[in-house]
C-alpha cells in the first residue's frame, strides 16, 4: 500500500476555509513565495504546485493564502503512522506525508484493498483527514496508484492488468521521471509509460545513464525493492543544507557568508551521525532559475565546518562565472566515511592544521550546545545577512540523504 495524507490537514485546522479555494504558500518576504500545496477547489481553477503566488492569484482571484504549519504536519503524520502500525510494522516513510506499507503478512485482516479501505475510514474517523491509497504488487505502482484517484479514494493496480491500466499514462507520472528526464524522453518521442517500457536498454542507458535502465524496470513492473520496517534507519549517504536567500547574492563575499552559515549545520549533523565527509558538492541557482552543480573530493575526510566551507567556496569560485546574481545555494557533504575509519593521508594536506581546526570546531560546537547556537560564531556572520529566518525540518528520504 502507498498512503498519501492529503494537505487537507491544513483545512482540518481551519474549518472556516472548507469549500474555499486554498493554497499553502511560502513566505514572499523570504523568497519562498510559491504554491506548496493546494486543495481541490483551487485545483479546479488551474492552480498548480510550484507556481508563483501572483500566477495563482491570476487564475483564482478569491484564492485564500495560508502559511505552512510544519509542526502540525509532523504531528498528524505521526498520528497517521500510529494507525498504520496497527496493521503492519513494515512502514517506510516517503517524505512528510507519504508512506509505503507492506501488508503481505496481514492476510488475516483481509485483502490489500480491504485493509486499505479500513485504514482510510479509520484515519478519517479518528483524525478527520482524507487519504488516498494505491494498492499494488510493488512500491512504484502503489505510489502511482495513490496519485490516480484523489481525495479519499483507493486505486488497485494488479500484476495481470497493469499494462492496460497504466501504460497509457504520461511517463512523468512514474516515480523517478522528473522534469529533466521527462524533457529528454519527450525529445525522442517517448511520452507514455508504455513507450518507456518498450524502449531499448542501450538507448536509455546512452541518453540517461543507469537511471534510464531503472525507470524502464519500473515501467515494466519489475521493481522488487522491499518495504522497510518502521524501525529501520536508512544509511546516511550524504548530508546537505540549502537555502533560498531573501535577496540575490551579488558577489563572492556574500556567497562565502551563506556557505559558512550552511556548513555549521552540516558539521553538527556529521558529528551526530559519526561521519566524515570525503567530498563536497554544491548547487547554485541563479535568478533566472537555472541550476548548476559541481563536486570534488577532499584530500582527507573531515567534520570541520570551516574546512568544508573553504572547500565549497573554492569549488564555487573556480566554476561560477557571475553571469547572473544567485538566488539559492546548497552545500552537501558526500562520500561519507565512519569517523573512526582508518584514513590514508595524502602528500598535500596540512594534517596538523586540519586536526587543530577540527578540535577547535568541536570545542565551538560544545559551547553552542550548552549556551545556544548564537553564543559563538564567525565574525563575518555578524554582519547583515541575506539569509532568511531559520525554519528547520529534517527529513530522511529513502535515498539516505538528510537535509
Model-predicted regions and their roles:
Residues 94-98, 136-139, 275-279, 324-328:
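Short Gly/Ser/Thr- and Asp/Glu-enriched loop/turn motifs at secondary-structure junctions
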Residues 99-105, 293-296, 344-349:
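Short, hydrophobic beta-strand segments
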Residues 130-132, 281, 328-330:
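Residues at or immediately flanking beta-strands
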Residues 64-65, 290-294, 341-342:
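Short small-residue beta-strand/loop micro-motif enriched in glycine and branched aliphatics
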Residues 7-10, 14-217, 227-230, 268, ...:
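Gly/Gly-Pro- and Ser/Thr-rich, intrinsically disordered tail segments characteristic of DNA damage-repair
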Residues 181-326:
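DNA-contacting surface of Y-family translesion DNA polymerases
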Residues 313-370:
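C-terminal hydrophobic structural anchor segments
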Residues 1-2, 6:
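Short, exposed "boundary/linker" segments that immediately precede the start
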Amino acid at each position: 500500500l502507498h498512503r498519501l495524507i492529503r494537505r487537507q490537514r491544513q483545512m482540518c485546522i481551519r474549518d472556516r476555509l472548507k469549500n474555499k479555494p486554498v493554497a499553502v504558500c511560502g513566505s514572499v518576504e523570504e523568497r519562498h513565495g510559491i504554491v506548496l500545496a493546494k486543495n481541490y477547489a483551487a485545483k479546479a481553477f488551474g492552480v498548480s504546485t510550484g507556481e508563483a503566488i501572483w500566477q495563482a492569484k491570476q487564475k483564482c482571484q478569491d484564492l485564500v493564502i495560508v502559511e505552512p504549519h510544519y509542526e502540525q504536519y509532523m504531528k498528524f503524520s505521526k498520528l497517521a503512522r500510529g494507525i498504520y502500525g496497527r496493521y503492519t510494522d513494515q512502514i517506510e516513510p516517503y517524505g512528510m506525508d507519504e508512506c509505503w506499507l507492506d501488508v503481505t503478512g496481514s492476510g488475516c485482516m483481509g485483502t490489500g484493498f480491504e485493509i486499505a479501505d479500513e485504514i482510510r475510514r479509520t484515519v478519517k474517523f479518528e483524525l478527520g483527514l482524507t487519504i488516498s491509497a494505491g494498492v499494488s504488487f510493488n512500491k512504484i505502482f502503489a505510489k502511482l496508484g495513490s496519485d490516480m484517484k484523489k481525495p479519499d479514494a483507493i486505486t488497485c493496480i494488479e500484476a495481470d492488468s497493469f499494462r492496460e491500466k497504466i501504460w497509457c499514462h504520461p511517463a512523468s507520472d512514474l516515480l523517478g521521471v522528473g522534469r529533466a528526464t521527462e524533457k529528454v524522453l519527450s525529445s525522442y518521442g517517448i511520452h507514455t509509460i508504455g513507450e518507456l517500457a518498450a524502449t531499448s536498454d542501450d538507448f536509455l542507458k546512452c541518453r540517461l545513464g543507469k537511471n534510464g535502465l531503472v525507470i524502464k524496470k519500473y515501467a515494466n513492473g519489475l521493481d522488487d525493492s522491499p518495504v522497510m520496517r518502521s524501525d529501520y534507519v536508512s544509511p546516511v549517504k550524504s548530508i546537505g543544507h540549502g537555502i533560498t536567500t531573501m535577496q540575490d547574492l551579488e558577489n563572492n563575499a556574500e556567497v562565502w557568508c551563506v556557505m559558512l552559515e550552511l556548513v555549521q549545520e552540516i558539521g553538527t549533523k556529521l558529528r551526530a551521525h559519526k561521519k566524515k565527509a570525503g567530498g563536497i558538492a554544491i548547487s547554485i541557482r541563479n535568478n533566472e532559475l537555472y541550476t548548476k552543480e559541481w563536486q570534488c573530493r577532499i584530500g582527507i575526510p573531515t567534520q570541520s565546518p570551516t574546512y568544508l566551507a573553504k572547500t565549497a567556496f573554492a569549488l564555487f569560485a573556480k566554476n561560477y562565472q557571475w553571469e547572473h546574481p544567485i538566488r539559492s545555494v546548497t552545500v552537501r557533504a558526500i562520500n561519507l566515511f565512519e569517523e573512526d575509519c582508518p584514513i590514508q593521508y595524502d602528500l598535500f594536506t596540512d594534517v596538523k592544521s586540519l586536526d587543530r581546526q577540527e578540535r577547535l570546531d568541536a570545542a565551538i560546537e560544545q559551547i553552542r550546545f550548552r549556551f545556544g547556537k548564537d553564543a559563538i560564531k564567525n565574525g563575518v556572520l555578524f554582519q547583515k545577512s541575506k539569509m532568511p529566518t531559520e525554519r528547520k525540518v529534517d527529513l530522511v528520504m529513502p535515498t539516505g540523504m538528510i537535509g
